[in-house]
Amino acid sequence: MYLKSLTLKGFKSFASPTTLRFEPGITAVVGPNGSGKSNVVDALAWVMGEQGAKTLRGSKMEDVIFAGTLSRAPLGRAEVTLIIDNSDNVLPIEYSEVSITRRMFRDGASEYEINGSSCRLMDVQELLSDSGIGREMHVIVGQGKLDQILQSRPEDRRTFIEEAAGILKYRRRKEKALRKLDAMSANLARLTDLTTELRRQLKPLSRQAEVARRAATIQADLRDARLRLAADDLVSRQGQRDAIVEAETMMRRDHDEAAARLAVASEELAAHEAALTELSGRAESVQQIWFGLSTLVERVSATIRIAGERAYHLDVDPATPSDTDPDVLEAEAQQMEVAEQQLLAELAVARTQLEAARAELADRERHAVEADKAHLEAVRAEADRREGLALLAGQVETMRARIESIDDSVARLSERIEEVTARTQQILAEFETVQGRVGELDQSEVHLDEQHERAVAALRFANERVAELQSAERDAERQVVSLRARIDALTMGLERKDGAAWLARNYSDTGLLGSIAKLVKVRPGYEAALAAVLGPAADALAVDSLGAARSALTALKEADAGRATLVLADWLADAGPACVTGLPDGAQRALDLIEAPPWLQGALIAMLYGVVVVNYLAEALGVVDICPQLRVVTVDGDLVGAGWVSGGSGRRLSTLEVTSEIDKAGAELAAAEAHMAQLNAALSGALSEQVAHSDATEQALVALNESDTAILSMYDQLGRLGQEVRAAEAEWESLLAQREELEARRVSILEEVVELETRLHNVEQIQHVHALDENSAAARQLIVAAAEEARGVEVEALLAVRTAEERVNAVCGRANSLRRAAAAEREVRLRDQQAHAARIRAAAVAAAVTDCGQLLASRLTQAVDLAARHRDALATERQQRSVAIAAVRYEVNTLRVRLATLTDSLHRDEVANVQAALRIEQLEQLVLEQFGIAPVDLIAEYGPQVALLPTELEMAEFQQARERGEQVTSPAPMPYDRATQERRAKRAERELAELGRVNPLALEEFAALEERYNFLSTQLEDVKGARKDLLDVVAEVDARILQVFSDAFVDVEREFRGVFTSLFPGGEGRLRLTDPDDMLTTGIEVEARPSGKKVSRLSLLSGGEKSLIAVAMLVAIFKARPSPFYIMDEVEAALDDVNLCRLIGVFEQLRGQSQLIIITHQKPTMEVADTLYGVTMQGDGITAVISQRMRGQQVESLVTSSS
């Protein structure tokens, strides 16, 4: 690895794009002072991640951008690109050439790229850290760096060795773990405080919960007794509804039968066919298609469940229509019409008879009056004459006026009677119209109830499906996380620290073929057995030849990197049988249990020749007795041979076993991830169905509420019309009584008028009565008797007329009412027929939906399986090939079906039996308000027919008696007894009062608090376990740092002695730890004593000597932990020619293993350079560069020309 080129654009004085191409060896950069030589060093440090502006000889980072000159405008950005030759794979990246670019803008924004791809600063630093280039940039020795090394604190000198040894990444890992520990400490303290507080609260709350539990038991007993008493009261008032309850029971039985048929039909569901089309070869597209198909499967399943629910409702028979026959009503209407005509005819005859009777009465009364008054006229004529004509005439006029007033009142009453009659008929017609509308709304209400129940059932199924899928998804996610954690833990276990690991990381010979654990495949279950037989070879590396093995072992020895086991791939061996006959059942050859590449078969035969695998140790001993030359191993890893046995517990898992476990966990992880993706797809479809069903339920509920409001309004209107009818009938009866009273008064006044007119006529005739004729008196008696008889006939005729009028009024309009009732009944029957036909059609459609849904679900399931197989195949091939796969795209014509479900029996019974419900409404309302339970449920659960089951106390006493051996019978249910239930209720009330105040929320609070305490306790244990794991990680990292630093310090100190001797012949120098007991934080002191000098402090040495000592320390680090390249900026400026020659000798030593880039003014340094770069700056302030491959004889001419 070496620096290949450096390109600068707008960096400091390099305004124009400038590329410096480097080669292995020593590259010298020369030029006058201020020409920009050190800017090359700054550019190298900057592009490799330097973040300190002062290190780059600036005050702020923006100073690296070209600031402009008098003739050149400033630039907006600086860009440096470094190309590194990585043909030896020192950098952990699969490229032979690595390009690192850093770009900075005037606004402070920075960009980093590796091989043209954007990355982070951390990525650049981690990439370079593995080659010994860290944050401190010890490979770049700039101006002032030598003084900094000697003047720095011992702890700061330590960082140079740590960076060269690659310890900084371990320190970063340790710092990360410590930060997690700090964050975890606060959580641990918080969890401890919470669990302590919760534990303190649990004890008093448990006592309250026990009291609440006892109170709940007593309250339940009291409620049960009260409910039984209320049920007894309600049953006693529901005698008239027994038939309805019986019908409801029958319909519930039909409902259960329909549900059973639905369950049987649900098992026969399949899916509709779907068409398969070609998919693209991309795994991402296959995944999307699989996800869509899984979503469709979930949606089709939800549709099938909804269709099944609707089919269940279609199996229930509707309510029996009314028994009223419209033809009978029509016949009754015709009979009423005939009766009305007959009554009208009778009324006409009665009126004719009344007129005739009145005429006869008037004639006879006239004769009677004439006869009677003829007798009196003579007697009273004299007296009347005295009274005066004026008085009689006034009385007559007064009477006539009263008669006229009565006639007017009678006429007005007759008109009002007719108006009231007409209004009554109109209200009755409106009443019947509203009643018909109520029937229509009831039918619509039934449909809306069915629709709402369907929506609610579908939503319930959707909610259950979503909850089920969410639970399954959480379980699958936990399984995936667990498997990933297991794979990570096993992978960490594969990080070996032996010679094999060193070879895998650092040895670049092509003869290395890989780890045996990754090249072979063992039959599952036999990993421990094969690992025990192979021994160290289970963790070995495969090489292609004996020569490659020799080279690898030589590299291990030179690097002192530990030991490694190598398996030769070119080994040839014969797999001849070794006593393979007579083996017991279950014994197998080890070679039959392992699969390997053909070129590795020879080595495996050599290692496993004569090895047999059995299940148990006893079998192994038996096989060795039969064939002593065999080696026998059990599946648990116990080895048996002739005269020896090896086994036991506590064996460390081999790489072969760990690799097998990783493969097994990987397969389980792939299956779990596929299952989780399938659950995600199903959950997406289920959530869509849930939202759709929720919206449908809301819409159905709104429509049902609107219908209920309309029905209540109609019932209010019916009540108002009924009140108006009753008020009109009362008014009609009152007006009729007033008219009859006025007519009677008119008859009485008319008789008085006739009498007064007769007296007035007699006075005017002025006749005197001298004698009374006895014969005329007798005739007068006969005439008066005839008049009385005629008056009786007239009264009977008048009564007959009034009776006929009342009968006519009673039947008037009854025929029309019956006809309207017949029409309404026909309309109801027509709607029932239409509903029945609709149910038949809906049943047929439901069957079609079920069949199509089953076929569609089957085809969709096949399509999902096919897509999953394609997806798994693509995942296995790891995108190595792109193939055309067949996928399924299906189209389904959505079936829109209007399904009519069964009418709810309870609702129909309530509507059909309104009058019966009104009689018990008060008691039902009382039960609902006090207990919150429906009357039907109350009777079914607490009615007199329900026996009282034994209490928990009675059963406990029975069990205790049986345990004591007593002869007791099991408590039997007790029949209902009202007196017993009343005593039971009073006893419960008394016990509840004795308990005193009860906290009703204690049970829930205690359960919630206990659950939280258990959860927090579990979390606390998890946090403690995680803290222990982190402490183990810190301890492991400290051990690693201690080992690496100790080895590195020993190597650096050794190299420092040699380099110091080279630079200071006869002198003595060494590196010393300030605190050897604390290798993690100890500093490094530099002790130097040049020849002939005895100094105790480095500050007493000359500037050249201090520079050489600093260079000696850096070179010692370079030799102990070599880096691919080093950059030195005028490190020999303070040296004389002798010391310069010595330093150049050290450079010559470093040239063999690393690339050197030196900024220098010294001619001897230029003479040893393989490549020479000349840097110059003209008056424009812009640096220019020229290069030349140099040898010693060309240096003088180039230096002269460049000056």
From Swiss-Prot:
Domain remark from Swiss-Prot or TrEMBL: Contains large globular domains required for ATP hydrolysis at each terminus and a third globular domain forming a flexible SMC hinge near the middle of the molecule. These domains are separated by coiled-coil structures.
Swiss-Prot/TrEMBL GO biological process terms: chromosome condensation; chromosome segregation; DNA replication; sister chromatid cohesion
Name of protein: Chromosome partition protein Smc
Residues holding ATP: P32, N33, G34, S35, G36, K37, S38, N39
Any Gene Ontology CC annotation: cytoplasm
Listed Pfam families: SMC_hinge (PF06470), SMC_N (PF02463)
Every SMC hinge domain range: 511-622
Entry function: Required for chromosome condensation and partitioning.
Claim: DNA-binding is one of the keywords in the record: yes
Family per record: Belongs to the SMC family.
Keyword hit for NADP: no
GO MF annotation terms: ATP binding; ATP hydrolysis activity; DNA binding
Keywords tagged on the record: ATP-binding, Coiled coil, Cytoplasm, DNA-binding, Nucleotide-binding
Cystine crosslinks: none
Organism: Mycobacterium leprae (strain TN)
CDD domains assigned to the protein according to its UniProt record, in alphabetical order: ABC_SMC_barmotin
SUPFAM superfamilies assigned to the protein according to its UniProt record, in alphabetical order: P-loop containing nucleoside triphosphate hydrolases, Smc hinge domain
InterPro entries: P-loop_NTPase (IPR027417), RecF/RecN/SMC_N (IPR003395), SMC (IPR024704), SMC_hinge (IPR010935), SMC_hinge_sf (IPR036277), SMC_prok (IPR011890)
Subunit structure: Homodimer.
Coiled-coil stretches noted in the UniProt entry, renumbered to this chain: 167-203, 250-288, 327-497, 657-689, 720-765, 976-1030
Compartment annotation: Cytoplasm
